[in-house]
């Protein structure tokens, strides 16, 4: 596969990465604001005809679980478009995925509608790309890329939380049969922060209580919490995150998982960004 450029977007700015021969390498960083946009435009001019992908890691997200009549083809597309319009998401950055038939009504389909709800966070960067001789192949969110991670895990319980860190912060996602139900980014949390894993546990507990209230998780169900982390953090993680009747914490070897996914430059820390970028190609 040809080289790719991957543009990783957070509220702090954008980082350009190159994917080559199943390895990712950071190229440059651009801060949020006019100076950063200008520098990014200059970078694009130096890489004409590059094929690129934008990966957004933003807290401004919305997830709506809908139950719709089971339709096919054009009728289904029109129904989904109409439902998205009724949600008044006020953003062009919307995706949907089927969660399968409703177990209580086989003539209905469960649908997750996901949206990036703050278009100004993306607009100036996308405008710079549009003005350059660059081919934008797609826009991904780290929340939806989590599904590709989840499918690589063994074993895969029917319901689980997936927890990982990126430069944007801590992300907690809920999966049901490998399909995303909910995702939340906690900005600013980093493994380099003092007391990080205790803060991580607090945020996971807060998220799980919300999901129990939404009936996405069962109270007292010992839901597996699969935490991607470097092995040198596993002992600290276990000490800070004891199991409870609601949650069962499972540290996962992030570098080993990255190698299993085919990444030839596995992370040397608990930062899952290199793996997510690889999965976006």
Segments predicted by a language model, with ranges:
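Hydrophobic/aromatic-enriched cytosolic interaction surfaces used to assemble or bind macromolecules
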Residues: 1-281
């Amino acid at each position: 596969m040809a080289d790719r450029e991957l543009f990783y977007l957070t509220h702090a700015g954008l980082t350009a990465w190159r994917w080559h021969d199943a390895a990712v390498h950071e190229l440059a960083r651009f801060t949020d604001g006019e100076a950063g946009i200008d520098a990014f435009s200059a970078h694009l001019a130096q890489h004409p005809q590059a094929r690129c992908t934008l990966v957004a890691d933003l807290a401004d997200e919305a997830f709506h679980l809908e139950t719709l009549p089971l339709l096919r083809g054009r009728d289904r597309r029109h129904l989904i478009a109409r439902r998205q319009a009724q949600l008044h998401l006020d953003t062009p950055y919307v995706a949907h995925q089927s969660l399968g038939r409703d177990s209580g009504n086989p003539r209905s389909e469960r649908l997750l509608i996901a949206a990036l709800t703050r278009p100004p966070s993306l607009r100036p960067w996308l405008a710079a790309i549009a003005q350059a001789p660059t081919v934008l192949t797609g826009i991904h969110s780290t929340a939806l890329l989590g599904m590709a991670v989840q499918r690589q895990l063994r074993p895969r319980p029917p319901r689980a939380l997936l927890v990982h860190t990126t430069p944007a912060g801590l992300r907690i996602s809920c999966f049901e049969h490998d399909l995303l139900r909910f995702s939340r980014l906690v900005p600013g949390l980093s493994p380099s922060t003092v007391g990080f894993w205790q803060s991580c546990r607090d945020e996971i507990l807060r998220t799980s209580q919300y999901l129990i209230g939404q009936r996405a998780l069962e109270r007292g169900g010992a839901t597996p919490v699969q935490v991607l982390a470097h092995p040198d953090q596993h002992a600290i993680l276990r000490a800070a995150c004891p199991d409870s009747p609601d949650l069962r914490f499972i540290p996962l070897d992030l570098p080993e998982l990255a190698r299993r996914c085919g990444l030839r430059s596995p992370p040397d820390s608990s930062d899952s960004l290199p793996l997510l970028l690889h999965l976006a190609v």
